Structures are given as C-alpha cells and as structure tokens.
Amino acid sequence: MNLYGYFLLLIIVIAFIALLPLFSGIGTFKLTKPKSSATAQSATGKLGKREYLKKKLDHTNVLKFDLKDTEESLGHDSASASSASRKFEIDSKTGLKRRVIGQYNKDPNDFDFDIDDLINEDELDERREEEKKLKKYNGKKNEAYEGFV
C-alpha cells in the first residue's frame, strides 16, 4: 500500500470512531456557529480566569457532542434501561458503589442441597459402573478382576 492508502484508511478509522456514539444512540453531534470573540474579550475583566477559559472554549468549538438525557433514553433504549435498574451498595469504608448480584447466606451449616441425596447418587453411579464392567466380561468375576490388574 502506498501513502495514500494509509491516509485513506486512517480517515475511515477516525470517522468510524467519531460516528460510533451516533450509531449506538448515546448522543448527537451539533454544528454551531462560532460567536464573535469581541464579546469574549470585553468580559475578561468581569470574569475569573476559569470562567473566561470556559467561555473561550465554548466560543471556539464549532462541533459539539451532546449526551442524551437518561430520562429520555429509559423508555427507548433497552441497554440504558437495564443499566439504570441495577442496584448498588455503598461501601462504608471507601464510599464507592458496589454492584449487588445477590445476597448469600454465610452459615456453613445451611446448605442448598441434601447431603444424603448426593451420597446416594454417588453410590448409584458406582453400582452402575460396576455392572457395566461385569457385563463387559459376561459375569466372569475372576476374569474381570484379572483384567483390572
């Protein structure tokens, strides 16, 4: 590939990355007309440094990206609706939120299953395997045991 091919590939990749939020429905791009810089310069004395820089940035950006509101997208988008319905616990030490998957019982004596049933199932499996081995050797125990050694 020559230089033009790489340049074209780069433009396609950048355009695809820029358009991904539009395809997924997260937000929209808006083109705005830049406002005159005279109004921004005259207000320099009244505004602080942070406000001045924020207004200057707003005036210079022609292409703006706006995220959709969560209230609007709850009814329309199933992905955001499922993420909004998740429950979180707040950790008391760090204050960070943690996703709640389920409440678990930490009592070691409380089981979800019956141990006797599991033991009986294992015994049945062992009997079935032994019967299969005996059928393989046609009920000849001595030959069956010799085959295992």
Curated annotation (Swiss-Prot):
Domain of life of the native organism: Eukaryota
Effect of disrupting the coding gene: Lead to ER retention of PMA1.
Cytoplasmic side: 28-149
One cellular-component annotation, GO: endoplasmic reticulum membrane
Bilayer disposition of the protein: Single-pass type I membrane protein
Description of how the protein assembles with itself and partners: Interacts with PMA1 and PSG1.
Name under which the protein is recorded: ER export of PMA1 protein 1
Organism: Saccharomyces cerevisiae (strain ATCC 204508 / S288c) (Baker's yeast)
